[in-house]
Design a protein with these regions (language model features):
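Intrinsically disordered, low-complexity activation-like regions
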Residues: 3-134
């Protein structure tokens, strides 16, 4: 999970290569979370990494899964879950608004909509999104 989801994001910031293994990471997260017994046994720190690909997905249903996983984390480590929750909601809100992450458009060779351009030029863009913009 760390190799597919985190390493590429940090090594290849601002390029399409940052997202090259998102599909593999997401598939692994989906497979792992289907096993509810396993999910209930794992510590909060592991659930955090299993949940990351859901946050990085441009599918709103995956963000709902991240919120559900955060609920499981809450029962194990309230502090960790409450720290992560605003970040999960922030990511989800962007997907709900645009249907994708506008800050990836340049790297993914996608055209911005007018609304996306206005957002990208605003102070609303979170730091984690700015870090992927070149």
């Amino acid at each position: 999970m760390i190799l597919f989801d985190q390493l590429t994001r940090n090594c290849f910031r601002g390029t399409d290569r940052a997202f090259a293994y998102d599909g593999a990471a997401l598939e692994l997260s989906r497979r792992l979370t289907k096993d509810t017994e396993l999910v209930n046994e794992l510590p909060a720190s592991v659930l955090h990494f299993i949940g990351s690909p859901f946050l990085h997905s441009e599918n709103l249903e995956d963000h709902d899964m991240a919120l559900a996983l955060n609920g499981v984390t809450l029962a194990k480590n309230e502090t960790a879950a409450m720290y992560a929750r605003p970040h999960i909601i922030n990511h989800r809100d962007i997907i709900a608004r645009f249907g994708r992450y506008p800050h990836r458009n340049k790297a993914m060779e996608r055209d911005n909509t007018e609304e996306e351009t206005a957002w990208l030029e605003s102070d609303e863009v979170p730091g984690w999104a700015k870090s992927q913009m070149k």
